[in-house]
Amino acid sequence: MPLIEVSNLRKTYGEHVAVDDVSFHVEQGEIFGILGTNGAGKTTTVECLQGLRTPDSGTMSVLGLDPGKDHTALRQRLGSQLQESRLPDKIKVHEALDLYASFYANPADTGDLLAKLGLTEQRDKYFGKLSGGQKQRVSIALALVGRPEVAVLDELTTGLDPHARRDTWKLVETVRDTGVTVLLVTHFMDEAERLCDRLAIFDAGRVVATGTPGELRDRAGKSTLDEAFVSLTGRD
């Protein structure tokens, strides 16, 4: 049984249709990508999955729970790093982790988590003094501190230099290798091709294709995921 199931999801804001008849599923232990340009409905979809927004229609199941009705129980089993989340500049790294750990009944050991993510030396540094890559490592640590079964990572590498992006990719793979299922939201084609076992391509609030990167390339008759995306979204 899939860990995440979405069926015919729809969400509007006034006259604007943000998500329109979206369906997909995520299997245990995979990195599943939600790929699309800005405004495609990616973030709205994952916010609905976390119980942060209420869809107009459709059904969702995350770890066998309804995000709308069971959001308190779901928060104990799902970790998230959202696109717009940001810590105060004057909070220290260990203070942020201790704060987030206090939200969970059985949190991870924060010292071990800092060590695994290469943040031990930054433990007493203020968040505002960290590099972009270090801030993203902290974001991943906060998403993992509750020992989640599913981690939602939204536009994780936006604004990072190429070296920091590749370091972050390795961390995401490490997270998956510990048994955590990852829902990765991105607009970077190379990131999706490198990391995702399967993915859903979003365009104008709809899912236009799902599959492995190789399946999507083959379906479009293209040699790269970038070219396949352009073809499948009708932009060529």
Functional labels for PLM-detected ranges:
Residues 58-66, 73-74:
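Conserved ABC transporter NBD signature motif
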Residues 98-102, 107-122:
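Conserved ABC ATPase "signature" region
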Residues 151-155:
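Catalytic Walker B motif of ABC-type/P-loop ATPase nucleotide-binding domains
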